[in-house]
């Protein structure tokens, strides 16, 4: 065992290197990640280029002059209502000097005023009186008053234009607002009090209070820039969230079992993205400083703010990846949190929140970052330009600390929830668990201590358990007691394990067997630490699985091979092994040696530099096993370690485990009973979570086996009844198990072995019976399993007590007869559709298929909803904007806007009102009048202040003159936009209070509704965005054919008889209406919301429907053409969407350029299909506009361009048809629309002579040649493969040298007769897959020909039945939907299809799964579905490629029975390929074995066993160890060439050469004598299995010259595909 020491630094470095390689090799994701980041940075630069920043220097006070200096003759006044008081007031206003010559009109009401203004005048001021003291000054929007309500803290309130200084509040003074306000206020005072103050009001003087230096930002671009700052790291958080979530879900638990520390996992991701964040922050800070978005704050402060924000988002992504299990949901939540919390920070920008709440919300890092940015802007706005260039960053430093705190806080929450959430549903983990001292320890000991105290040695008293040999007592390595595991899903409790008790011994290989869902994987997961038991306890080498410290020891001792493959696809084989070696704690200097050892052990040297994603499924499985054996562990926990491996690789794994059995513990699960039989010393059967039995193969076969299988190969002259009579004569309770042409099989009871010598002697001495050869084999573990499962379904409590179940077995003849009857009912020829009726049915089936797929395509639906939502949102926002623009508003002008009330605490930005008395007299009466207005005053009674030098005040009133005649100077802080109108009201009310203390004047400002004069501009702006949106949609809804091609569903449809035109038009029949509906829905929404004057007519709608429909068809079929061309690459819907967008964008730009409009418009409509929507819409809009102005006859010809999309559609249909004919897959039927007929490929002679062939292969070649030339169609086989050869072009190693050809098959000839199932077997690379592809038509043969159903041209079948190795299914469709669609494709009528579906579902027990989506099905049920699809419609030729892979034995039996029932005694033939020899033995009438591209042998299974089987297997079980040596001496005397195999002492195993055993009668006679002499418990003698024959023949592939012509990688991967 290699020394292992867990090292966090080593693990972190290994994982970091893995992440770096991930970035390097997943180039597309890395490119997009950095592209999006770069685009956001470019957006920052763009906004800053458009952004205006004002660095305003300090300025002393500015005198605006007297109020009566206003002089403007361009406006008029309209007032309402008309009352004597309002008339007197306005008459007095008309006498003011600057009102001379101005019109003042009276209006009875506001509606009349608005109408009057809209009809006659453009520059009007409205005066609306509420009462004698309250009125509203109403202006046209944007005229004479500012358009905003108030300055914001960060916006510029003054601008410098050379020597001219302009401040926003001066607009009130300069354009007449305060002049008119002062005149009206003076008139109100005079009318209501009979005291004139007109002179005082007209002498008002305005001044700016001293303007401090400031840096001001400008408006919307600031908000946009801040928003982009918030989402600057979103591309990084998206990819880190997705990567971490996927890796945690798939790999982290498995790596933790190997010893991975949590800190190493998070550090590896954090360090990588920390560096990326550092670089992005550096660039962002540089941009901010270069463009001077922030002036006064130093580089490091800004850098720190951005950097800690980025790190906090990384921590937030980690936290969300723990809380949420799906990567899509994690990405979405992180992005929404970033946007929402960051946008909430705008409340800090506009001071909507109290400071305390701002700091509380800073626990959300996006808000804290936004608060920091706001603080930077405020520093620029408030701090003098000559101050320290670092500013006053105390608040910013506090925010940076909060961001640092947020990052640490999120990390702590990540660690906390990672410990709590996975264990929350088990025992004592609670949310206050973090308060305990053992927070980071997994503690399950509360339920173990009692069990340990009461522990006793467990004895199996049931006779279902074979007693353990004495030599293993005290070698208990794994002890399991009362183990229970419950799963809770949707409030439903499922017991995976139920009180399971078991010991696993050192020095033994133990197999866990059981049906799917029995609990095998759950048990192994509990033992490996991947999940926690509900109750019970486990010790491994005296280490308690419940203790954290013991778990670490266990991880060092254990090698785990889980059911799913463990590897990173973007790493090579060698890199994966190095990574996991370091995770396991193998010392750095030993890693390379250990990796080399594993590569050699598993024969993976040729694949060590291949990326895992390019490996076959079997090679990936082998790599997972290699990772498990890294470090030479003492305990192997293997969950189906050889699933998917070819026989050679499987035997290599078996030999590896056998060689290391002595000092180690091997516990594995498997679905292959033969594997358990050959490899395991002890087999443990689990059913529904309970332990059923355990023992050696011999024990189990004797107790539950059905006996020996006697197989006889017969000549044509044999008489079946005579042979059966002879067998019954010797063994009356024997049973005939199988009968077919040339073959008989019997079951002989185990307890009748004493009768075997006489039976075999009579068989050997009776040549007249027509027996060519015979063989005998012991019952298989599969039969034991089926009998156990049959018993467990009857009685869960007791196995071994019901004799009738043992006799009947789990798979009774009645069940087979039932399956045969159900399937045979389908063999009658149902009437199939043809011609256009079939084409239309296929079209409808594909349309339905496309609808069902879109229903579950989340991304496409999101895109459609998003596009529709954006379009409708744009229309809604345009209407809201129009409504706002056309609506009026009214803003109050009151002192509380800027000034405190008496006794109020200081509250920025409110201040006291400064009163400066420069009259030299007391002004107590005026002061008292001001105090009546509830204003906090600060009075300079002696006039010592200037009043305009202190910018801390919002406003000041400076009184001069004498006590009888005041002169007022109004000084305003330029930051307060409405200061002048407010101070005018304060002065007016001060004067009014002298005469009428209870009265109060109130002035408001408002605007008139704006006229709707932007209709055309609105339409064009909407239209531009709408066209660009629509251009992005087709790639997302019309490129699913790429998915169909890559998962081979398209090939499955083609081989099922689908016409190419029906496939494409069927998809279009659904997609075109969806796309049209999307376009027209936005059109209709626009029309519905448009103003009455812009409503379109029915004729307009007709024209738009015409060109929209044509555009949809043309662009959808253009997308089909693109999909066909790029079907072998990635789908890249987003990239093609971007291309469509760019083409549409530039096309629109050319169309909208006035100079080129007429030329570009017509050219682009005619030549650029994506531009036709925009072009036709713009053309239609222009035709409509021109028709309203002037009639131009030549414009009538422009309507012909609306037919351009239909022309494009026809062109793309023709292109698609030509591509299908030239480059498409071979069709099975004549396409009535595309006019494509099944191709008849040219036949080339095979250049290679078949020298040195086996005689059976030569005979098959002759028979095939005769069948090929036979004129009797009825006698022709279902499949004829004659002289097939396939060559592939190899890659050039040098541009000078010619590339070597790779020969996949050389000269293959065989046929499949009607009613026959032929098995095609071979090692990986032998040529099986290529042969299948040539038969299906997927690959053209280089020489030779294939005939199906008797003819290669005129009478080809309309479709083939094909069950591919990979499940060519749509994951979101249900089983019934699959069956209905394929039935329609094959031409079955609906009534016939429903009957067939029900019967096939009954035959294969699929009734419960008919409504289940495929993605929820087990692998075994998926294989059943693929098989049913292959035989649906009664095809005459069926190809089955490993049909029972992934099934448990029960499912395999169902499948095999269905295959036998489907083809037995019918006119159909089947070709089956498999790696599972038991499957071939169960269903094949004949077997052909391929070696190195050649047919090595062919014949019945018994014939091949007799011809090529070299050995028999003898197993004997002794009662006492003392018998071993004498018995061994006797066996060696009787069988001199016997080879003893390694087993534990009570079980003796020998391999006997065939010549030592023949004749069988003598062999059994000798063994019966031995049994009596040595009092053996039991023995068995069995012929070589087909697997052993296959292995012997396949070894020739390594010895011949086949590899000389092939690249070394051919040994590890399937033969090259033609399309590659």
UniProtKB/Swiss-Prot annotation:
Expressed in lung, heart, liver, skeletal muscle and testis. Highly expressed in the liver, and is also abundant in heart and skeletal muscle. Highly expressed in heart. The keyword Disulfide bond does not apply. ATP 2 binds at residues 1322-1329. Residues 478-713, 1284-1517 form the ABC transporter domain. It is a multi-pass membrane protein. Induction: Down-regulated by digoxin. InterPro entries: AAA+_ATPase, ABC2_TM, ABC_transporter-like_ATP-bd, ABC_transporter-like_CS, ABCA, P-loop_NTPase, R2_ABCA1-4-like. ATP 1 binds at residues 514-521. PROSITE patterns: ABC_TRANSPORTER_1, ABC_TRANSPORTER_2. One of its GO terms (cellular component) is endoplasmic reticulum. It holds the Pfam family R1_ABCA1. Glycans are attached at residues 454, 482, 967. Cholesterol efflux is increased by extracellularly applied taurocholate. Keywords: ATP-binding, Cell membrane, Glycoprotein, Membrane, Nucleotide-binding, Repeat, Translocase, Transmembrane, Transmembrane helix, Transport. The chain crosses the membrane at residues 30-50, 224-244, 263-283, 294-314, 328-348, 357-377, 397-417, 861-881, 979-999, 1019-1039, 1068-1088, 1105-1125, 1133-1153, 1159-1179, 1196-1216. It catalyses: taurocholate(in) + ATP + H2O = taurocholate(out) + ADP + phosphate + H(+); cholesterol(in) + ATP + H2O = cholesterol(out) + ADP + phosphate + H(+). CDD domains: ABC_subfamily_A. It is an enzyme of class 7 (translocase). Its EC number is 7.6.2.-. GO terms for biological process: cholesterol efflux; cholesterol transport; positive regulation of cholesterol efflux; regulation of cholesterol efflux; sphingomyelin biosynthetic process; xenobiotic transport. One of its GO terms (molecular function) is ATP binding. It is found in: Cell membrane; Basolateral cell membrane. Belongs to the ABC transporter superfamily. ABCA family. Mediates cholesterol and taurocholate efflux. Through the interaction with ABCA1 potentiates the cholesterol efflux to lipid-free APOA1, in turn regulates high-density lipoprotein cholesterol levels. This is ABC-type organic anion transporter ABCA8A.
């Amino acid at each position: 065992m290699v020394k292992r020491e867990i090292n966090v630094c080593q693990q972190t470095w290994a994982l970091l290197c893995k992440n770096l390689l991930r970035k390097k090799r997943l180039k597309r994701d890395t490119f997009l990640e950095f592209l999006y980041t770069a685009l956001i940075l470019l957006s920052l630069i763009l906004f800053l280029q458009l952004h205006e920043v004002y660095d305003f220097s300090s300025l002393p006070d500015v005198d605006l002059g007297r109020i009566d200096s206003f002089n403007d003759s361009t406006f008029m006044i309209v007032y309402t209502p008309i009352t004597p008081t309002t008339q007197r007031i306005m008459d007095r206003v008309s006498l003011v000097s600057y009102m001379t010559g101005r019109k003042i009109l009276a209006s009875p009401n506001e509606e009349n005023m608005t109408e009057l203004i809209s009809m006659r005048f453009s520059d009007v001021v409205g005066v609306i009186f509420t009462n004698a003291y309250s009125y509203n000054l109403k202006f046209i929007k944007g005229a004479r008053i500012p358009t905003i309500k108030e300055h914001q803290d960060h916006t510029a309130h003054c601008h410098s234009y050379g020597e001219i200084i302009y401040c926003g509040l001066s607009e009130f003074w300069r354009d007449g607002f305060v002049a008119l306000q002062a005149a009206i206020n003076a008139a109100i005072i005079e009318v209501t009090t009979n005291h004139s103050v007109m002179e005082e009001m007209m002498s008002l003087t305005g001044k700016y209070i001293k303007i401090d230096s400031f840096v001001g930002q400008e408006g919307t671009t600031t908000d946009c820039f801040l928003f982009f700052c918030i989402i600057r790291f979103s591309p990084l958080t998206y990819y880190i969230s997705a990567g971490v979530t996927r890796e945690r879900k798939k790999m982290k638990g498995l790596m933790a079992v190997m010893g991975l520390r949590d800190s190493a996992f998070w550090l590896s991701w954090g360090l990588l993205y920390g560096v990326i964040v550092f670089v992005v922050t550096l660039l962002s800070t540089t941009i901010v400083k270069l463009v001077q978005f922030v002036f006064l704050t130093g580089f490091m402060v800004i850098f720190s703010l951005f950097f800690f924000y980025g790190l906090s988002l990384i921590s937030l992504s980690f936290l969300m990846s723990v809380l949420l299990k799906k990567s899509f949901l994690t990405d979405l939540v992180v992005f929404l949190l970033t946007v929402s919390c960051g946008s909430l920070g705008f409340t800090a920008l506009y001071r909507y929140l109290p400071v305390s709440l701002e700091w509380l919300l800073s626990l959300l890092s996006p808000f804290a970052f936004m608060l920091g940015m706001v603080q930077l802007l405020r520093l620029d706005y408030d701090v003098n330009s000559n101050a320290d260039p670092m500013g006053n960053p105390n608040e910013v430093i506090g925010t940076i600390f909060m961001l640092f705190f947020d990052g640490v806080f999120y990390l702590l929450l990540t660690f906390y929830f990672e410990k709590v959430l996975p264990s929350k549903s088990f025992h004592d983990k609670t949310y206050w668990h973090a308060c305990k001292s053992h927070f980071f320890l997994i503690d399950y000991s509360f339920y173990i201590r009692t069990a340990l105290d009461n522990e006793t040695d467990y004895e199996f008293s049931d006779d279902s358990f074979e007693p353990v040999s004495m030599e293993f007592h005290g070698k208990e390595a794994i002890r399991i007691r009362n183990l229970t595991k419950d799963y809770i899903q949707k409030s439903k409790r499922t017991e995976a394990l139920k009180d399971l008790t078991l010991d696993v011994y050192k020095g033994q290989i133990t197999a866990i067997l059981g049906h799917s869902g029995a609990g095998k994987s759950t048990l192994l997961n509990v033992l490996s630490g991947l999940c926690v038991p509900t109750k019970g306890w486990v010790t491994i080498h005296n280490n308690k699985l419940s203790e954290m410290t013991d778990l670490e020891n266990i991880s060092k001792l254990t090698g785990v091979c889980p059911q799913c493959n463990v590897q990173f696809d973007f790493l090579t084989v060698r890199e994966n092994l190095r990574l996991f070696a370091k995770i396991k704690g193998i010392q750095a200097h030993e890693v390379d040696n250990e990796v080399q050892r594993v590569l050699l052990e598993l024969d993976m040297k040729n694949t060590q530099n291949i990326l895992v994603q390019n490996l076959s499924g079997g090679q990936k499985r082998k790599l997972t096993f290699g990772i498990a054996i890294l470090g030479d562990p003492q305990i192997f926990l293997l969950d189906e370690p050889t699933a998917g491996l070819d026989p050679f690789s499987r035997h290599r794994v078996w030999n590896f485990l056998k060689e290391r059995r002595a000092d180690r513990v091997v516990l594995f699960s498997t679905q292959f009973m033969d594997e358990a039989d050959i490899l395991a010393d002890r087999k443990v059967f689990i059913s529904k979570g309970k332990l059923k039995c355990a023992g050696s193969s011999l024990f189990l076969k004797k107790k539950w086996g059905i006996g020996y299988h006697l197989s006889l190969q017969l000549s044509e002259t044999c008489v079946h009844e005579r042979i059966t009579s002879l067998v019954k004569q010797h063994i009356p309770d024997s049973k005939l198990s199988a009968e077919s042409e040339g073959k008989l099989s019997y079951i002989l009871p185990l307890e009748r072995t004493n009768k075997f010598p006489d039976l075999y002697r009579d068989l050997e001495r009776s040549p007249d019976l027509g027996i060519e050869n015979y063989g005998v084999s012991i019952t298989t573990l599969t039969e034991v399993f089926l009998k156990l499962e049959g018993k467990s379904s009857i009685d869960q409590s007791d196995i071994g007590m019901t004799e009738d179940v043992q006799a009947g077995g789990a798979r009774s003849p009645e069940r087979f007869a039932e399956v045969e009857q159900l399937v045979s009912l389908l063999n009658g020829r149902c009437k199939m559709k043809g011609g256009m009726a079939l084409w239309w049915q296929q079209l409808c089936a594909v349309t339905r298929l496309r609808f069902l797929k879109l229903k579950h395509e989340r991304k496409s639906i999101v895109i459609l909803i998003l596009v529709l939502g954006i379009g409708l949102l744009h229309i809604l926002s345009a209407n809201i904007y129009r409504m706002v623009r056309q609506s009026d508003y009214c803003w109050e002008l009151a002192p509380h806007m800027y000034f405190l009330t008496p006794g109020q605490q200081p509250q920025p930005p409110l201040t006291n009102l400064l009163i400066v008395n420069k009259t030299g007299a007391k002004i107590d009466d005026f002061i008292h009048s001001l105090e009546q207005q509830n204003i906090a005053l600060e009075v300079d009674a002696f006039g010592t202040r200037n009043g305009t030098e202190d910018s801390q005040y919002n406003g000041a009133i400076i009184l001069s003159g004498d006590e009888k005649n005041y002169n007022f100077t109004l000084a305003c802080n330029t930051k307060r936009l409405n200061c002048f109108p407010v101070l005018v009201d304060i002065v007016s009310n001060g004067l009014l209070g002298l005469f009428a203390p209870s009265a109060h004047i109130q002035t408001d400002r408002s605007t008139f509704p704006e006229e709707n004069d932007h209709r055309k501009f609105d339409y064009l702006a909407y239209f531009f965005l709408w066209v660009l949106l629509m251009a992005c949609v087709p790639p997302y809804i019309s490129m699913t054919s790429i998915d169909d091609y890559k998962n081979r569903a398209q090939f499955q449809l083609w081989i099922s008889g689908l016409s190419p035109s029906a496939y494409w038009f069927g998809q279009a029949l659904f997609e075109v209406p969806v796309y049209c509906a999307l376009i027209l829905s936005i059109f209709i929404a626009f029309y519905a919301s448009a103003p009455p004057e812009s409503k379109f007519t029915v004729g307009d709608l007709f024209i738009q429907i015409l060109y929209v429909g044509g555009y949809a068809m043309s662009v959808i079929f253009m997308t089909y053409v693109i999909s066909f061309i790029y079907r072998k690459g990635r789908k890249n819907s987003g990239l093609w969407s971007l291309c469509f967008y760019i083409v549409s964008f530039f096309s629109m730009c050319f169309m909208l350029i006035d100079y080129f409009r007429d030329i570009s418009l017509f050219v682009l409509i005619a030549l650029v299909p994506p531009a036709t929507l925009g072009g036709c819409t713009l053309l239609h809009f222009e035709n409509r506009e021109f028709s309203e102005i002037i009639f131009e006859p030549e414009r009538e010809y422009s309507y012909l361009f609306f037919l351009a999309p239909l022309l494009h559609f026809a062109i793309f249909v023709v292109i698609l048809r030509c591509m299908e004919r030239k480059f498409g897959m071979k069709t099975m039927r004549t396409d009535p629309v595309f006019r494509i007929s099944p191709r008849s490929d040219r036949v080339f002679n095979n250049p290679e002579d078949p020298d040195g062939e086996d005689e059976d292969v030569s005979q098959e070649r002759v028979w095939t040649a005769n069948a090929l030339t036979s004129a009797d169609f009825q006698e022709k086989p279902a499949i004829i493969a004659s002289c097939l050869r396939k060559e592939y072009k190899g890659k050039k190693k040098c541009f000078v040298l010619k590339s070597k050809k790779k020969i996949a098959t050389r000269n293959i000839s065989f046929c499949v007769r009607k009613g026959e199932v032929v098995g095609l077997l071979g090692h990986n690379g032998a040529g099986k897959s290529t042969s299948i592809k040539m038969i299906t038509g997927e690959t053209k043969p280089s020489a030779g020909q294939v005939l199906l159903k008797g003819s290669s041209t005129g009478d080809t079948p309309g479709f083939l039945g094909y069950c591919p190795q990979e499940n060519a299914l749509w994951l979101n469709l249900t089983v019934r939907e699959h069956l209905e669609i394929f039935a329609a494709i094959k031409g079955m009528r609906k009534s016939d299809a429903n009957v067939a579906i029900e019967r096939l579902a009954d035959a294969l027990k699929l009734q419960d799964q008919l409504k289940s989506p495929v993605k929820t099905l087990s692998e075994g049920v998926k294989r059943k579905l693929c098989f049913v699809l292959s035989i649906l419609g009664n095809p005459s030729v069926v190809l089955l490629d490993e049909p029972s892979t992934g099934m448990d034995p029960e499912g395999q039996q169902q499948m095999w029975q269905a295959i036998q029932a489907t083809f037995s005694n019918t006119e159909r033939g089947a070709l089956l390929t498999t790696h599972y020899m038991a499957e071939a033995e169960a269903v094949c009438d004949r077997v052909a074995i391929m070696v190195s591209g050649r047919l090595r042998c062919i014949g019945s299974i018994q014939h091949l066993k007799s011809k090529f089987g070299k050995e028999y297997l003898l197993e004997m079980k002794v009662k006492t160890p003392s018998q071993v040596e004498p018995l061994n001496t006797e066996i060696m005397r009787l069988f001199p060439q016997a080879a003893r195999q390694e087993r534990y002492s009570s079980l003796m195993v020998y391999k006997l050469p065939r010549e030592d055993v023949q004749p069988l009668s003598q062999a059994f006679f000798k063994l019966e004598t031995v049994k009596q002499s040595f009092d053996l418990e039991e023995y068995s003698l069995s012929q070589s299995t087909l697997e052993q024959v296959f292995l012997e023949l396949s070894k020739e592939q390594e010895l011949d010259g086949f590899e000389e012509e092939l690249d070394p990688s051919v040994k590890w991967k399937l033969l090259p595909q033609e399309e590659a």
